[in-house]
Amino acid sequence: MRWALLVLLAFLSPASQKSSNLEGGTKSVTRPTRSSAEITCDLTVINAFYIHWYLHQEGKAPQRLLYYDVSNSKDVLESGLSPGKYYTHTPRRWSWILILRNLIENDSGVYYCATWDR
C-alpha cells in the first residue's frame, strides 16, 4: 500500500528571529512515500547568515534538522540524521528551498524556517 504524506508548512515570526513572509502563513504539501518534497522559505533579510530548518511533530518538541551556512553555501545536518535526506537549494537571492528525499510516513509534520545570527 502506498502512503501519502502530509507536510504542513508554518512560518512563525517570534521576536528573536526572522521568518518567512508567505501570505497566509501555512501551506500544505502531500506526497507519496519514497518521493521527494520541496519546501520554500522566502526571507527578505539582508544579513541572513544562517537559515535553520525545523520539524515539529504532534506530541514532540520541535527538532532542528539542519542549518544552511549562507556564506559558505553549505548545509550542516544535526547529528543522527541521514546524509542526503535533507538539503537546501538557493534558486535566487533571499529564497531557500528545503528538499526532502525518499519520504517516509515519519516525515509528516510542520516544517519551519528561520534565520538567526548563528
From Swiss-Prot:
Specify whether Glycoprotein is a keyword of the entry.
yes
Keyword list (alphabetical) reads: Adaptive immunity, Cell membrane, Disulfide bond, Glycoprotein, Immunity, Immunoglobulin domain, Innate immunity, Membrane, Receptor, Signal, T cell receptor
**Disulfide bonds listed in the record:** 41-113
Per the UniProt entry, the glycosylated residues are: 106
Biological process (GO) annotations held by this record are: adaptive immune response; innate immune response
Q: Taking the first listed entry, what is the main subcellular location of this protein, grouped into a coarse class? A: membrane
**Which InterPro entries does the annotation name?**
Ig-like_dom (IPR007110), Ig-like_dom_sf (IPR036179), Ig-like_fold (IPR013783), Ig_V-set (IPR013106), TRG_var/const_region (IPR051117)
Tell me the ranges covered by the Ig-like domain, including all copies. 18-118
Span of the secretion signal? 1-17
SUPFAM superfamilies assigned to the protein according to its UniProt record, in alphabetical order: Immunoglobulin (SSF48726)
Q: Tell me where in or outside the cell this protein is found.
A: Cell membrane
Q: Which GO terms describe its cellular component?
A: external side of plasma membrane; T cell receptor complex
Q: How does it assemble?
A: Gamma-delta TR is a heterodimer composed of a gamma and delta chain; disulfide-linked. The gamma-delta TR is associated with the transmembrane signaling CD3 coreceptor proteins following the stoichiometry: a single gamma-delta TR heterodimer associates with one CD3D-CD3E heterodimer, one CD3G-CD3E heterodimer and one CD247 homodimer forming a stable octameric structure. Upon activation, gamma-delta TR complex associates with FCER1G to initiate intracellular signaling.
According to its UniProt entry, the function of this protein is described as: V region of the variable domain of T cell receptor (TR) gamma chain that participates in the antigen recognition. Gamma-delta TRs recognize a variety of self and foreign non-peptide antigens frequently expressed at the epithelial boundaries between the host and external environment, including endogenous lipids presented by MH-like protein CD1D and phosphoantigens presented by butyrophilin-like molecule BTN3A1. Upon antigen recognition induces rapid, innate-like immune responses involved in pathogen clearance and tissue repair.
**What is the protein's name according to its record?**
T cell receptor gamma variable 5
Q: Which organism is it from?
A: Homo sapiens
